[in-house]
Regions:
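Carbohydrate-active catalytic/glycan-binding domains of CAZyme proteins
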Residues: 19-339
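Bacterial N-terminal signal peptides that target proteins for export
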Residues: 1-4
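Hydrophobic h-region of N-terminal signal peptides that target proteins for export
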Residues: 8-17
Length: 339
């Protein structure tokens, strides 16, 4: 009996250990939707960045005025501010914080769209689409402006980028292997194709023309699995391209986030995304118009058709291609960046 007791004492801890769930299974999956704006219910165009001062993740997004009952035409997507949400649990849950204090309001009814943000030498740089007013249609100039901030909350104007036309939107900025910078954007005057500009120092920019002869907006460039990737919004899902040199891009036949999901507010195409790579995982943050699902569309111009929310899914790499299953539970685990 004594020998049996010794054996049981040795075996019991291993049984308990075997029954203990893995750390990942104990975590909660991200909710659907991931985030809804409490002011206008029109969150879109997300970008995620680590806030060094607060030691939390921040999400910046275009705050479309979906619930504005006085809007007519497309005024509800103009006159917009940039909202901020915060996550203290590695990106699983997000809480509305404020709108960004952007010190560039040169025109009455000014419009801020689709920021991208990078950090360099302790200073944050925002590249923001600026529209000089609130308009009922799309036929007006738009430029990309650069602002800087020490704290991600308060932003000072630096310059308007010298890009190729006066109708450009949706900056995506990436540090090249040699330490210089490249910015991709949508040139609306050239069939909404993707153009690019380079800078040695984030201050002086040279436009090099077309990067991708494809219609699309909201380019996002990132590195994962020893390749560079670009994802663009084609209004029918997200087109994927890969490159070895950040100049020559090969298309992937299949789009991602084209087929509707089953989760709450995720039954429409995914649009204008950000991708965060952390600890070998890549998470795609995108927005949907829940009221624009093909199966059950809301009436045109209704609040239900205008509202938008942020969702998240984990990217998967298989046979040289990117894919994602938006219906899989997504365990977001964004780690503090090493820098």
């Amino acid at each position: 009996l004594r020998l049996l007791g010794i054996v049981l004492a040795m075996v019991a801890p291993s049984i308990v250990a075997a029954q203990k769930p893995a750390a990942k299974s104990a975590a909660k999956p991200a909710p659907k939707p991931l985030f809804s704006d409490p002011i206008y219910d029109g969150a879109a165009d997300p970008v995620i960045i680590w806030n060094k001062q607060r030691q939390k993740w921040w999400m910046f997004y275009t705050n479309r005025r979906a619930t504005d009952t006085t809007a007519h035409g497309v005024t509800w997507v103009h006159g917009t501010r940039i909202g901020i949400a915060e996550s203290g649990d590695g990106g699983t849950t997000w809480t509305y914080r404020d709108t960004a204090n952007i010190n560039y309001r040169s025109d009455r009814g000014y419009t801020h769209w689709a920021p991208d943000i990078v950090e360099d030498k302790g200073l944050y740089h925002m590249f923001l689409t600026y529209v000089p007013g609130t308009f009922t249609d799309w036929n007006h100039p738009r430029v990309i402006i650069q602002l800087t901030s020490p704290d991600l909350q308060n932003w000072q104007y630096v310059q308007t980028l010298p890009l190729i036309t006066d109708k450009v939107i949706d900056a995506s900025v990436f540090r090249l292997p040699d330490g210089t910078w490249r910015l991709w954007y949508n040139n609306e005057r050239d069939h909404k194709s993707i153009y690019y500009a380079d800078s040695p120092d984030l201050r002086h920019w040279t436009d090099h023309g077309q990067a991708l002869n494809e219609r699309g907006e909201g380019p996002k460039v990132f590195r994962w699995h020893e390749q560079y990737w670009m994802i663009i919004d084609q209004w029918k899902g997200m087109a994927v391209y890969h490159s070895d040199d950040l100049l020559h891009w090969q298309p992937q036949p299949e789009r991602i986030l084209e087929q509707p999901g089953q989760g709450r507010d995720d039954q429409a195409i995914g649009g204008h995304c950000d991708v965060v790579v952390s600890a070998g995982h890549a998470y795609v943050f995108y927005f949907t118009h829940p009221g624009r699902s093909k199966a059950n569309p809301a009436p045109a111009n209704s609040i239900a058709a205008k509202r938008s929310v942020i969702q998240v899914a984990e990217l998967e790499f298989s046979n040289g291609k990117l894919k994602c299953d938006r219906d899989k539970p997504t365990y977001v685990q964004l780690l503090k960046p090493r820098k």
